[in-house]
Amino acid sequence: MRRSAFTALLRREIRMMNREPAYLLNGPFTMLLLPLIYGMMYLSGSLRLPPETAELMQGNAGIVIAGAVGAFIGSTSGVAATAVSRDAKNLRLIKSLPLPMKRFMQAKLAHAMLFAGTGACIGVGGSAFLFSLTPLHAAGSLMIALSLALFCNLLALMLDTVHPKLHWDTPTAAVKHNLNTVIMFF
């Protein structure tokens, strides 16, 4: 079965992320670790929220807040902020292929959005569970989270395109010593 160039590039991005533990543990693992910590705090009873919080979350502000939580968790993976830097050793090969650079960037953005979508679902799902949001409010929050995550990932990809970390000795350095990830956290 013949695949499109975009699908092949997206599969390449996914394989590269899964093949290198440093990429996976220093990036997408963060979006799993944060909700896990908050979940443990909630279950242990150490996460105490004022009673007014539940009331606030039932209104329209709850949709925006849950969406912002989902967007934050979805954007913490750093996949887009290190997309070009992780390919630094292969840039000459990539430039020599008869494909427009637009396709490479679209695949990198789609890869980042796969993780952002997962993180947004985790963040909005956790907020919906914690504050008993209605399905309609949760769906609205998810749309907000995905929109904000797309915006953040576009900014991160542009930042890494303009200022990539091209010289690194180990794959870990491409992710851990990259200031683009820290900049995108803020």
Give, region by region, the residue ranges found by the protein language model.
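Hydrophobic alpha-helical transmembrane segments of membrane proteins
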Residues: M1-R92, P100-F186
